[in-house]
């Protein structure tokens, strides 16, 4: 029997306030991680200016990716029809909050900053998540699978191109990659729909644009 999503038991104003707070926390706040930073015990070896600039650009991309993931998952969860689906999305979002905090910490260590366009990234991802969720929970889960698979691929790219001595960034990205793969597997097991071919392609193009811009801004 399908269970009603808990969000549907709250008033529209309650739901609006919850979503607004989530957006503010993600974009402007500094939400704490529930798990220890994977780089905590890894030596912070000094990078030269070019290595530091490149590492910061990559970690800014990863931070934006987590902002987008939060927007996507919260948008999907807001319109989820089934309580189990909503729980899955919010649980994944919590792990993405850990990633967000770890990437923010590493950016600070690299004397850099998050993307100036984070409000735009979040808003666009939230809208996409809500639209996907309105098509049905299977569509919503399908977007989770495709998103996480594409994130896995760009994490692999970053692990290849990070400076060899930047082991702190590498430690963070390795754990993130494990988490993303698990999120995709869990979404598939929960009944994700395979998305029509044009959608993954469009998502890949949007991701490429985001990475190009976020590396600098």
Swiss-Prot record:
Pfam families: COQ7 (PF03232). It is an enzyme of class 1 (oxidoreductase). Coiled coil: none annotated. Its cofactor is Fe cation. It comes from the Bacteria. Pathway: Cofactor biosynthesis; ubiquinone biosynthesis. It is found in: Cell membrane. It catalyses: a 5-methoxy-2-methyl-3-(all-trans-polyprenyl)benzene-1,4-diol + AH2 + O2 = a 3-demethylubiquinol + A + H2O. Fe cation 1 binds at residues 66, 96, 99, 180. GO terms for cellular component: plasma membrane. Keywords: Cell membrane, Iron, Membrane, Metal-binding, Monooxygenase, Oxidoreductase, Ubiquinone biosynthesis. Its main location: membrane. Its EC number is 1.14.99.60. CDD domains: DMQH. GO terms for biological process: ubiquinone biosynthetic process. It is a peripheral membrane protein. NCBIfam families: DMQ_monoox_COQ7 (NF033656). Belongs to the COQ7 family. This is 3-demethoxyubiquinol 3-hydroxylase.
